[in-house]
Design a protein with these regions (language model features):
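Short pre-catalytic strand/loop immediately N-terminal to key active-site residues, enriched for Gly-Thr
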Residues: 60-64, 204-206, 233-238
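PLP-dependent aminotransferase-class I/II
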Residues: 94-149, 153-159
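Catalytic PLP-binding core of fold-type I/II PLP enzymes
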Residues: 155-189
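Single conserved hydrophobic/aromatic residue that forms the stacking wall/gate
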Residues: 1-8, 12, 240-241
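PLP-dependent aminotransferase class I/II
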Residues: 16, 40-45, 214-215, 219, ...
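Glycine-rich loop-to-alpha-helix module at the N-terminal edge of alpha/beta enzyme cores
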Residues: 9-89
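Active-site PLP attachment segment
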Residues: 190, 198-228, 239
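Buried hydrophobic positions in well-ordered alpha/beta secondary-structure cores of metabolic enzymes
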Residues: 23, 51, 75, 88, ...
Length: 242
């Protein structure tokens, strides 16, 4: 029973007694340990282990942040860092958040106009248009897409479109980012919407119902890719499940 109130965050109802109990238990210990992740908490590792046990083999490292838009920011950074490219591709109708990078790959101009200029080298293709994918080449660092668009009105792409997108990313060494901040955590009948398309992203971003009303988000990728964030500069080692 997934309640869609409060921007799709309350997936296990409001003030579920078990959630309240666990929050109180954690407050009695501590809430935060060191800014740059010099120490990790056991409960963070348990969260990472539990989540990644439900995901495909290459999605085996979780980095925890405060929100979905932060998860998308980190995913975009990782795509650029891993490929040493600058171009990002998103889709018309997309919404990925309101921070600088996430807003850049979002498509609603009413939300973007007051904050321009945003990130350069961002291109928006028509959503669910198979032919438009031919625009993509080896100059692209990452492609970010909602497996089901939310802000645009619950738009579901075709199986053909999603599988061609995965194939093009593989052929051009592009990182494919699935933003499941709205569509994830069981809202489609599977834990994540990408499971309906028989493909797996390189990076998965999560939020909203992932925290059940608490301010938490995350992005999941492979240990190999996540290790790029270990230094120069790092993103906080405590949030990496290895």
């Amino acid at each position: 029973h997934c309640v869609t109130r409060r921007q799709r965050q309350m997936c296990i109802r409001d003030r579920h007694p078990q959630i309240i109990k666990e929050i109180k238990k954690q407050i009695d210990k501590h809430l935060h340990v060191m800014v740059f992740g010099e120490y990790s908490q056991r409960i963070q590792n348990e969260l990472a282990e539990n989540l990644t046990s439900l995901l495909p083999e290459n999605l085996n490292c979780l980095y925890v942040v405060n929100s979905g838009t932060e998860a998308n920011e980190a995913a975009l950074k990782l795509a650029k860092r891993a490929t040493k490219r600058t171009k990002l591709v998103a889709f018309k109708g997309a919404y990925h958040g309101s921070t600088h990078g996430s807003l850049s790959v979002s498509a609603n101009e009413d939300k973007k106009a007051a904050f321009r200029p945003l990130l350069p080298d961002v291109f928006h293709l028509p959503f669910n248009n198979v032919e438009a994918l031919d625009f993509i080449d080896k100059s692209v660092a990452g492609i970010i897409i909602e497996p089901i668009q939310g802000d645009a009105g619950i738009r579901i792409p075709s199986f053909e479109f999603m599988n061609k997108l995965r194939k093009i990313c593989d052929e051009n060494c592009i990182l494919l980012i699935f933003d499941e901040i709205q569509s994830g955590m069981g809202r489609t009948g599977k834990l994540f919407a990408f499971e309906h398309f028989d493909i797996v992203p390189d990076i998965l971003t999560i939020g909203k119902a992932f925290g059940g009303g608490m301010p938490i988000g995350g992005f999941v990728t492979s240990q190999k890719l996540m290790s790029l964030f270990n230094n120069h500069p790092n993103l906080g080692l405590s949030l990496i499940h290895i």
